[in-house]
């Protein structure tokens, strides 16, 4: 388990979160990649942040959970960056992503954020 991962996410919750990311991508707005995700957290526009667990080197995303905590933004870990990238609409993996407008996934994003808080 990477240093920055401080709680385990059940597989069914991860699947639900990735599905919500896909809906948000299609009906709302999503930021993809470490830099875009970091900026959305800092600007207060992120509603839910995704961080991949298989990022090498770990330092690329190590700051994101701490920053999200500081700004009060819920975040979830995803096992594979390929899964995260595909859910965000990329043909390649993504180390991080953020939902900035949930669109039709609004209720799902809130539900996932609540479940993640319970895990912590």
Curated annotation (Swiss-Prot):
User: What quaternary structure, including any partners, is listed in this protein's UniProt entry?
Assistant: Part of the 50S ribosomal subunit. Interacts with protein L15e. Probably part of the RNase P complex.
Where found?
Cytoplasm
Organism whose genome encodes this protein = Haloarcula marismortui (strain ATCC 43049 / DSM 3752 / JCM 8966 / VKM B-1809)
- Keyword terms: Cytoplasm, Ribonucleoprotein, Ribosomal protein, RNA-binding, rRNA-binding, tRNA processing
InterPro entries hit by this protein: eL8/uL1-like (IPR050257), Ribosomal_eL30-like_sf (IPR029064), Ribosomal_eL8-like_CS (IPR004037), Ribosomal_eL8/eL30/eS12/Gad45 (IPR004038), Ribosomal_eL8/Nhp2 (IPR018492), Ribosomal_eL8_arc (IPR022481)
Q: Which GO terms describe its biological process?
A: ribosome biogenesis; translation; tRNA 5'-leader removal
Q: What is its main location?
A: cytoplasm
GO MF, one annotated term: structural constituent of ribosome
The protein's job, in short, is: Multifunctional RNA-binding protein that recognizes the K-turn motif in ribosomal RNA, the RNA component of RNase P, box H/ACA, box C/D and box C'/D' sRNAs.
Q: Record's Pfam families?
A: Ribosomal_L7Ae
> Looking at the record's lineage, which domain of life comes first?
Archaea
Spell out the protein name for this chain: Large ribosomal subunit protein eL8
Protein family according to the UniProt entry: Belongs to the eukaryotic ribosomal protein eL8 family.
Per the record's keyword annotation, is Manganese included, yes or no? no
Q: What are the coiled-coil residue ranges?
A: none
GO CC terms of this entry: cytoplasm; ribonucleoprotein complex; ribosome
């Amino acid at each position: 388990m990477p240093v920055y991962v401080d709680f385990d996410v059940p597989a069914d919750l991860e699947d639900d979160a990735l599905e919500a990311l896909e809906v948000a991508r299609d009906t709302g707005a999503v930021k993809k990649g470490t830099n875009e995700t970091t900026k959305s957290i800092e600007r207060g526009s992120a509603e839910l942040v995704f961080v991949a667990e298989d990022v090498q080197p770990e330092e690329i995303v190590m700051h994101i959970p701490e920053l999200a905590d500081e700004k009060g933004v819920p975040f979830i870990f995803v096992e594979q960056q390929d899964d995260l990238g595909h859910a965000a609409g990329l043909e390649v993996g993504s180390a991080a992503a953020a939902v900035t407008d949930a669109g039709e996934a609004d209720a799902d994003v809130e539900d996932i954020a609540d479940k993640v808080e319970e895990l912590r």
